[in-house]
Amino acid sequence: AEDRKSLSGLTEQEAQEFGTLYTQGVAFVAVIAIVAHALVWAWRPWLQ
């Protein structure tokens, strides 16, 4: 039984792994952005 390939060319297992890594990457960038905004807010608050 060979693995059926999807339109993306990934197997289900590969797609699951990619999705996990992608989600972790997005979360990492979001945390960096939140920390950066907090630091800038501490330096020069906006919307007073």
From Swiss-Prot:
Q: Which organism is it from?
A: Rhodocyclus tenuis
Q: Which GO terms describe its cellular component?
A: plasma membrane; plasma membrane light-harvesting complex
Q: Which domain of life is it from?
A: Bacteria
Stored InterPro entries: Antenna_a/b, Antenna_beta_CS, Antenna_beta_dom_sf, LHB-1/5, Light-harvesting_complex
This chain's protein is named Light-harvesting polypeptide B-885 beta-2 chain
Cytoplasmic side, ranges: 1-20
Task: Report how it sits in the membrane.
Answer: Single-pass type II membrane protein
**Periplasmic topology ranges:** 44-48
Q: Which Pfam families match?
A: LHC
* Signal sequence, renumbered to the chain: none
Subcellular localization is given as: Cell inner membrane
**Which segments cross the bilayer?**
21-43
Q: Give the UniProt record's GO annotations in the biological process aspect.
A: photosynthesis, light reaction
A GO MF term: electron transporter, transferring electrons within the cyclic electron transport pathway of photosynthesis activity
Q: Where does a bacteriochlorophyll bind?
A: 37
Outline the subunit composition. Answer: The core complex is formed by different alpha and beta chains, binding bacteriochlorophyll molecules, and arranged most probably in tetrameric structures disposed around the reaction center. The non-pigmented gamma chains may constitute additional components.
- Family stated for the protein in its record: Belongs to the antenna complex beta subunit family.
The free-text function statement in the UniProt record for this protein reads: Antenna complexes are light-harvesting systems, which transfer the excitation energy to the reaction centers.
Q: What are the entry keywords? A: Antenna complex, Bacteriochlorophyll, Cell inner membrane, Cell membrane, Chlorophyll, Chromophore, Light-harvesting polypeptide, Magnesium, Membrane, Metal-binding, Transmembrane, Transmembrane helix
